[in-house]
């Protein structure tokens, strides 16, 4: 058996355009924007161009819009793209909103997708400090749970796992059953 020191559920909302994102975080029906510590975006100038992808974090719990905006060093250059998709993520349990845990999740996400993330250069060699497992849940902008066959060129695994022996595992649940 393997010892998993940290297990987190991340709830992702998206895909959103930039206007939808701004409207979503300001919405009165939205969970508190300060709960969102993670963001992922992908963009391409047009259908002939390759996708550019970036995953990032906002360690302060003062609203994701303070980080993911037109002044962002990577995001700003893609605002004029024809295809721009944004996902924002929060811990399912807000007690996990601590800087070290946010950073650990970011490192796992970057390691899992480093070959597809074109804009994450600094953290590609950095590993989580201990074993960690992430369960991703996907929601649309109305906060309805989505099935797991969602069109995403990247970043679509339900489970991500890192073991201290430099073992990475990732994948999707083959079948999700809803007991309604």
Model regions and ranges:
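Boundary/linker segments flanking structured domains
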Residues: 1-53, 57-180
